[in-house]
Amino acid sequence: MGLGVESKLGDSIVTTRLDHAVNWGRSYSLWPMAFGTACCGIEFMAVAGAKYDVSRFGAEVVRFSPRQADLLIVAGTISYKQAPILKKIYEQMCEPKWVISMGACACSGGFYDNYTTVQGIDEIIPVDEYVAGCPPRPEAVLDAIMRIQEKAKTESIIKDRVKEYKGFLDA
């Protein structure tokens, strides 16, 4: 329902809400940072390759600094020694930020059920999308990126998720 202004302006001006415009831009300009520690890190290279063309989703520029990234892809096993490093990388990312847990090891510890391995990175940082598999297919990772895009289109532009999440390192 318009205010009646649209009929007088014609096609020369488009009206929208600020949330919609900002979220549209965010959803098509995701800047991923891969935290690859095992086989899934190698599989992520296939996702970033030409065959799967991740650039059509606006995520082709892989960053190597957390301050330049807004999508963290954790691919592989995380040990308890690596947990504070992963937490620090997540905290250095600017808002809004999203996390994909890629592979069985990142999602649930994989077959490493021992005292040195974190049984899922959701014990450390909040996770937006889980991609199962050992290693997962590149199509599954692309599907997770598309779901992150949908989340980016619907989120409020003034949300801070760091303050509302408590992992085992915060205790």
From Swiss-Prot:
Its cofactor is [4Fe-4S] cluster. One of its GO terms (cellular component) is respiratory chain complex I. InterPro entries: NADH_UbQ_OxRdtase-like_20kDa, NADH_UQ_OxRdtase_20Kd_su. Transmembrane segments: none annotated. Keywords: 4Fe-4S, Cell inner membrane, Cell membrane, Iron, Iron-sulfur, Membrane, Metal-binding, NAD, Quinone, Translocase, Transport, Ubiquinone. NDH-1 shuttles electrons from NADH, via FMN and iron-sulfur (Fe-S) centers, to quinones in the respiratory chain. The immediate electron acceptor for the enzyme in this species is believed to be ubiquinone. Couples the redox reaction to proton translocation (for every two electrons transferred, four hydrogen ions are translocated across the cytoplasmic membrane), and thus conserves the redox energy in a proton gradient. Belongs to the complex I 20 kDa subunit family. This is NADH-quinone oxidoreductase subunit B. The lineage of its organism: Bacteria, Pseudomonadati, Campylobacterota, Epsilonproteobacteria, Campylobacterales.
